[in-house]
Amino acid sequence: MYCTRKVNDDYTWVGADCRRLALFEGVFGVPDGISFNSYLLTDEMTVLFDTVDSAVRRTFRENLAHALAGRELDYIVVHHMEPDHAAELADMVKDYPRVQILCSAMAKTMVGQFFGPELAGRITAVKEGETLCTGRHTLRFVAAPMVHWPEVMMTYDETDKLLLSADAFGCFGALNGSLFADEMDFDRDFLDEARRYYTNIVGKYGPQVQAVLKKAETLDIEMLLPLHGFVWRQDLAYFLGKYDLWSRYEPEVRGVMIAYASVYGNTENAANVLACRLAEKGVKVKMFDASVTPASYIVSDAFKYSHLVFAATTYNMGIFVTMEQLLLDIAAHQLAERRYALIENGSWSPVSGKKMDALLSPLKGWSAIEAPLTVKSALRPDQEAQIERLADTIAADVAKDPATDTDENGEKHRFVCKVCGYVYEGGTLPEDYKCPLCGAGAEYFREEA
């Protein structure tokens, strides 16, 4: 039996929830399920916006047939060619022989790649700003390349002032009968999953998201209809603001996220001691065991927190495997502008700190707070002062107001250590400053042009 929800008088949600899928895209755990959203506009013409993943095809087809109520389907608008939204295209053409497909030029190429040449005669490529009048409604197409594939576009309904936003503004989690974000406590129940969705699916493409947000500013939007998660009809500024923050890589919390990877518990102990000292100083701390918690959750909180600490055992003269994979994941998502500290452990030749720094230091705007803390097998009582100093340094850095860490013109400068390459960012370089990595004094720093 059908299971649809009305978005408004002319739009109907005809998508489906899936709770059987363990890993979205084969990578990201979705313990609370996920929705595959598809929307039908019934006007003088009928328009379907995207299809769904083949995992929920039966529910989708029943929903679509019910919403059409015997009418023909005139158009399918393809916003995004990923198979979780386009898997049913070929069957739609078989079921509705009059239907025409509208998509971007690059999506048209991808349709051929996924389904062969048979659909070519049904496809019209549309460009930025082109419109389709369906009767009462005028649809305007908006290019959104690399959010998060190159062929992506969105559709703005000028009549109902709603934006069908493809994969932007989505969320992990099944809808559970709800459709609108205002039907539940979104902050409490879904904000973390919305952040995890953004950071892992779209997070790499911050500049492209910023470009879409600038386009959105020119539109009078009263409703957001994404391809995953809830429809937004209230508090749009709140959620658009979150996307603005995330896509600028601005942290939401001034605090410390600590991720560690430990073989026998000694590296974990060092991380716990540091967390305790930081908490005693009033610093907000979040901890993860990289060998237990899937990377997508840690990546999400790396976007959330201003300061990051990574602690790892040396393993086969490298970084312990789960930490190495986590850091590669963070680097792949191009998280920017973070302050970090490292703890390394090794019984005879600890090198994990150097190896971790080699992965993190090239990232845009990343800078080390302090030289790596080295543990030889286990943290010793005579290292208490080192832990305390590291905690003091991190706490002081967290307490800085980033808005005031500028020169008299409100600008930040980058000062590079000529000895080791460490980068200090701020308004001016203090005269008594010493490089946290090599100990070189301020005279060994040069300002980047």
Give the predicted meaning of each segment:
Residues 4-66, 154-157, 161-165, 256, ...:
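Conserved beta-strand hairpin/beta-sheet module of binuclear metal-dependent hydrolase folds
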Residues 5-9, 103-152, 208-211:
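Metallo-beta-lactamase
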Residues 44, 55-102:
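Active-site metal-binding motif and surrounding structural segment of the metallo-beta-lactamase
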Residues 426-427, 443-447:
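Short, non-ligating residues that shape and space the ligands of small metal-coordination modules
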Residues 426-434:
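Short linker/helix segments within small regulatory modules
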